[in-house]
């Protein structure tokens, strides 16, 4: 897989946003937390991830390029809040009351757990499975575990083991 090149202006916008919210947090909390490392290696449908111990934020380059400023405005403070909560409170629920407080009271942004960006360009192929009551879509990773006999999946509604039917077209 080739690496996407993020334009310098977009990287600068990410860092400007990050620094703005970090400054807000440091002023509000009376702290001097350092600037986290930022990279653009997040894959799949996740917009970003916060790596707590390494104080690092990973951003999805495809979703960033497709959504630009809305991505920056939503995802950067979301992931920064995870890092700040970990530094301030230790290990707590990922989107718990501490995280919501950090988002709303400290960073002054809405506390949204998930993004609403279009993910068709980053979604992987899925595989159709069936139970007694409905059809399910499994990712390639889960499908391969079934094929290798490493896992089996059951319906949360009826409890029946899922049976493979077809591959979903892209």
From Swiss-Prot:
Any one Gene Ontology molecular-function term assigned to this protein's record: zinc ion binding
Subcellular location: Cytoplasm
Cofactor note: Binds 1 zinc ion.
GO cellular component annotations of the record: cytoplasm
Major localization class: cytoplasm
GO biological process, alphabetically ordered: response to stress
Domain SprT-like: 22-165
Active site: 79
Superkingdom of the organism of origin: Bacteria
Binding-site residues, Zn(2+): 78, 82
Gene3D superfamilies documented for this protein: Metalloproteases ('zincins'), catalytic domain
Record's keyword terms, sorted: Cytoplasm, Metal-binding, Zinc
Matches recorded under InterPro entries: SprT-like_domain (IPR006640), SprT_Zn_ribbon (IPR035240), Uncharacterised_SprT (IPR023483)
Cofactor: Zn(2+)
Pfam families in UniProt: SprT-like (PF10263), Zn_ribbon_SprT (PF17283)
Similarity field: Belongs to the SprT family.
Protein name: Protein SprT
Natural source organism: Yersinia pestis
Lineage: Bacteria, Pseudomonadati, Pseudomonadota, Gammaproteobacteria, Enterobacterales
